[in-house]
Curated annotation (Swiss-Prot):
One GO term describing the cellular component: cytoplasm
Location in the cell: Cytoplasm
Protein name (Swiss-Prot/TrEMBL): Lon protease
Keyword Nucleotide-binding attached: yes
Organism: Chloroflexus aurantiacus (strain ATCC 29366 / DSM 635 / J-10-fl)
Molecular function terms from GO: ATP binding; ATP hydrolysis activity; ATP-dependent peptidase activity; sequence-specific DNA binding; serine-type endopeptidase activity
Source taxon at top rank: Bacteria
Keyword ATP-binding included in the entry's annotation: yes
Recorded name of the encoding gene: lon
Induction profile: By heat shock.
Amino acid sequence: MNDETLREQTTAESEETSPTTPSPEPEVVETLPLIPLEGAVVFPYIVVSLTLDELGSASAEAAAREGRQVLLAARRPDAPADAPITDQLFNVGVVARIEQLGTLPNGASGVVVRGLVRAVLGEAVQTTPYLRFRFTRRPDVFERTPELEQLMVEVHAAIDAVLELRPGVTQEIRNFVRSIDDPGHLADNTGYSPDYTFAERQELLETFDVSERLRKVLMFYRKQFALLEVQAKLRQEVQESAARQQREFYLRQQLRAIQKELGEDTSEAAELDDLRQKLAAADLPEVARKEADRELSRLARINASSPEYQMVRTYLEWLAELPWNKYTGQPIDIAFARQVLDEDHHGLQKVKERILEYLAVKQRRAALGEENLRANREPILAFVGPPGVGKTSLGQSIARALGRSFVRMSLGGVRDEAELRGFRRTYIGSQPGRIIQELRRAGTADPVILLDEIDKLGIDYRGDPAAALLEVLDPEQNHTFTDHYLNLPFDLSRVLFLATANTWDTVPPALRDRMEVIELSGYIEDEKVQIAQIHLVPRQLRANGLRPEEAVVTEDAIRCIINEYTREAGVRNLERSIGAVLRKVARRLSEGEIDPANTPFVVDAAFVRAALGRPRFTNETRERIDQPGVAIGLVWTPVGGDIIFVEASAVEGKKELTITGQLGEVMRESAEAALTYVRSRARSLGIEPDFFETHAIHIHVPAGAVPKDGPSAGITMATALASAATGRLVRDDIAMTGEISLRGRVLPIGGIKEKALGAHRAGIRTVILPRRNLIDLDDLPPAVSAEMTFIPVDTLDEVLSIALLPPATTTDTLTVAQRSDVLTPAS
């Protein structure tokens, strides 16, 4: 043992005193105590201090007794704790000499060691009470070739360049690195760079070839140099920017001091004072005032050239310009409100009555005091109806009756929640949402805000705008509405919200629950004539530069436009057409074709046809229903009621049913049910027993480009099928609607009022409908009820007995008067 230890000491001394190239010698297997290292790598030639655990301390004490040489090897970080000790350690370590062994101030054992030479571990000889391993020494073996010398020069240069960029590196350290002439020593000394990871250090230790080790070091330091060069450039830019800002700040402070001495004010100081005055005049709530004061103090400390200065300034300007406590509403006068509604809108009596009731309740509750007003909040009114029936103008009339500002906020196509609630101030270009923007534009905290086209809100990955409206329209929450940009509560409880929609089905249920629906149906012809004479014609005369004494539009001309050019539920296209006609008059007056002495120029039906061209709509009912297999049905659409033609045809051939016209699933099922019922009644209808076995049935609903669905065409399809199978014509003065069951029962459907108005517009005055829908006729205008006949039915047999003409009868030989004895007016 003494001989072995002596040989180890001699070898170590030889390595330390002669770092020149050793001669290759046969590998000698030795044994030494081993200290396992946690997350550390020791290189040859390096002196380090280590903290020891119990096992390492025992190994160090054994080594000190035997000759002060010890093995050092790092543990593998991914090795299981219960694995054999040989599997826990890297197989390449270092032989080191213990320079000092003792106790650290914290009571743990410590040791100072000097690395001597690399070692390749063998098997464990002893594991308790300390570790002892077999190993072989792996001294550096190299030949000083020109290539190696050039490699050392490049490594020296790379290390020197990195040290040059590192702050705090002394000249003494640079000189020490330059003085290292041994290639292996040079490579190993770099292993303690703080930029090396544990894995990179172990990889460097396991590289026995000196040239390869130097190449790895060179590659590493070149990467470090590139990284440090970028960091140095960025650091220099930051320092220059900071120095420039500091210099500007110093100069500005000097300029302020000089201007103050001269009695001059600076623009920044003036801006701050102006903002303070605006914020003081804005009558901010306590929470908003504290936030404004905090942001003002912050603004005073920010350089005016900084982007943050503009962001804070814009935010404070928003706070100053919002109408926090500005109210313009007048006490509600119900008589004045009725007068305004009657002036602005013709008809709509039930709608006006509901609005007046709504305003009366607000008036009574306002008289009871603010506390009661907050305790029981009224619902939000939603006007639902076809385009052009006056939904938006009703909101304007309500605002005029209340003496408030009117704001129309179109929601059609809005898909981003932030459009309503605003963008947070962390984003560049952020701003408040449209609700806060409209309040600033209105200049008052109690305007009438009309949420137009609320049924056309969209939804995508940016959020659900309908969900954002829940807080806005909820009377229990909107007194603390928080916009993302302001990040402050704003009281919306005094705002009168109204909404409009063409259809109620697409509005989310939670949003529907917060609103009360007021339905507006389409206008009948007489109402349109009155609206045109009172409102549309005078407005279009002014719009086209005509005086009332220069042009007169007759009632016949208006009816011509209604019936032949604008078959619609509302009056929007009617106004456009009147404008188009009056533009022709204005041009003729300007060109001298009309003698001013002969004014007023009378616009009659003939002039309308000449101005607007070929009529867009004609009464084609008789032409389209002059063959068996065609029946007239009624449909409801978002733009009002209308008629449809259902066609059925029976062709000799294979038994099958074909359905065309882009019909939905419900309509297809109605067609199948209608066919089944007609087949079941074949004998009573006089249809041959094998007719449906030898004929292919085709049902078609024209306007194939328009999707159609719903159950209300059931009796129409059954009537068309019965007509096609029997060869009997369907009456051309009757339209029908109703769902059919397999037993021939006629079931109730919806949209009766709109469908009846659609039939009236199309010139049809007799309608077959389910008996259980008679109650819906109470909503019809009296003028329509007086002109139309409604026939309630319970079964399809009743429908067929009324709608089908007798065999061999044509629509030309049977007059309406002769048919009237079949019909019974609705009771």
